[in-house]
Design a protein with these regions (language model features):
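RNA pseudouridine synthases
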Residues: 1-158
Length: 158
């Protein structure tokens, strides 16, 4: 769950010293290259948050690494810990719901809505747009339905 509604993550990204398959943030700049990601929360579903990210730099796994750094790994991202229930209840019903969501979207939930670049020879701007894939839309619908059913009862627990 991302705490702030929007913000900027700045930190050097380089190969993790403990796991060569992962990248990591190095706050002190001792490793890696400078990386900047701006994020904005689009929707909240309890402990799951839909976030939009805009990159100033293009480092390997930048969004995945910066979101993990915030304590919000990408949904179902097994490399960076998003395939585990990190927060919230561990009751069987909730666990089964999450497992069903993992099955509905059997990959990390990262989608490039738009990509753009300047052609190196012509200087022409290129921009490509893409809609959110159906499996990710399905998971969002599931969370919307689940949290709508659970939220009215939240006050009764407190």
């Amino acid at each position: 769950n991302v705490k702030e509604d929007e913000g900027t993550i700045t930190g050097h990204i380089g190969r993790s010293l403990s796991d060569r398959l992962q990248m990591a943030v190095f706050e002190d700049g001792s490793e890696g290259k400078h990386a900047v990601t701006h994020y904005k929360v689009l929707q909240r579903f309890g402990y799951v948050t839909v976030v939009s990210c805009k990159l100033e730099t293009g480092r390997t796994h930048q969004i995945r690494v910066h979101m993990k750094y915030l304590g919000h790994p990408l949904f179902n991202d097994e490399r960076y810990g998003g395939d585990k229930i990190l927060k919230g209840t561990t009751f069987t019903k909730y666990k089964q719901f999450i497992i069903n969501c993992f099955k509905a979207c059997p990959r990390h939930a990262l989608h490039a809505k738009s990509l753009g670049f300047t052609h190196p020879k012509t200087g022409e701007q290129h921009r490509y747009e893409s809609v959110l894939p159906e499996d990710m839309q399905e998971v969002i619908r599931k969370f919307d339905s689940y949290t709508s059913a659970v939220e009215p009862h939240k006050d009764e627990e407190e």
